């Protein structure tokens, strides 16, 4: 890895969201990883928790962020923290895609993005196994899911 990562460099992943792994765990001795992600209009990332902190930098568009029981909107240029082990969700509030950078500390969960991008659609067992390996727990029964969908038309 070079000291400069170009805008078109990184590992492109398939899946529902366009994800590019820009910096991997092995590049930083496990300190951090960096991904770039495009969130489609109206898309909601289900409330979940994980064992690392994630800093989100909004490059374009605007995202909604739920952290714990607080909701905030983050426009281009803003930063948001999704702390480890705290329930959180994100969604695109606009009619155009939102582009974000996520800094994962410590590193490791970039592998979850890589693993889940390779799963066949509907492979719930593979998805659950990857979540378990990487300490990620989705909460589809969270009352926040319904609230966010209704409030923001997601």
Walk through the language-model features, giving the residues of each.
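Short glycine/proline-enriched turns and hinge-like loops at secondary-structure junctions
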Residues: 31, 49-50, 93-94
């Amino acid at each position: 890895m070079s000291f400069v990562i170009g805008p078109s460099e990184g590992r492109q992943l398939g899946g529902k969201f366009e994800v590019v792994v820009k910096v991997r765990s092995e590049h930083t001795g496990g300190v951090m990883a960096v991904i770039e992600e495009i969130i489609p209009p109206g898309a909601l990332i289900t409330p979940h928790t994980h064992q690392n902190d994630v800093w989100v930098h909004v490059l374009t568009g605007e995202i909604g962020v739920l952290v714990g029981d607080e909701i905030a909107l983050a426009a281009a240029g803003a930063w948001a923290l999704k702390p480890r082990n705290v329930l959180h969700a994100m969604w695109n509030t606009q009619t155009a895609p939102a582009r974000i950078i996520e800094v994962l500390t410590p590193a490791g969960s970039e592998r979850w993005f890589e693993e889940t991008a390779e799963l066949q659609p509907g492979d719930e067992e593979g998805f659950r196994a990857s979540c378990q390996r990487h300490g990620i727990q989705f909460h589809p029964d969270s009352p926040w899911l319904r609230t966010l969908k209704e409030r923001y038309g997601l």
